[in-house]
UniProtKB/Swiss-Prot annotation:
GO terms for molecular function: structural constituent of ribosome. This is Large ribosomal subunit protein bL33. It comes from the Bacteria. Keywords: Ribonucleoprotein, Ribosomal protein. PROSITE patterns: RIBOSOMAL_L33. Belongs to the bacterial ribosomal protein bL33 family. GO terms for biological process: translation. GO terms for cellular component: cytoplasm; ribonucleoprotein complex; ribosome. Signal peptide: none annotated.
Length: 50
């Protein structure tokens, strides 16, 4: 199965808030998105972690 589950971590408070899937064969670099962090209560950058 080429798609793997990834987790996104808030860059400010380091909480793991979101999960998603990605194809690691076509997208080798780590993703970064702006999403709403419930703990910070504002939009923050979220980076992909293992």
């Amino acid at each position: 199965m080429p798609r793997d589950i990834i987790t996104f971590q808030c860059t400010e408070c380091k909480n793991r808030n979101y999960t998603s899937t990605k194809n690691k064969k076509t997208t080798t670099e780590r993703l970064e998105m702006k999403k709403f962090c419930r703990h910070c209560r504002k939009h923050q950058g979220h980076k992909e972690i293992k």
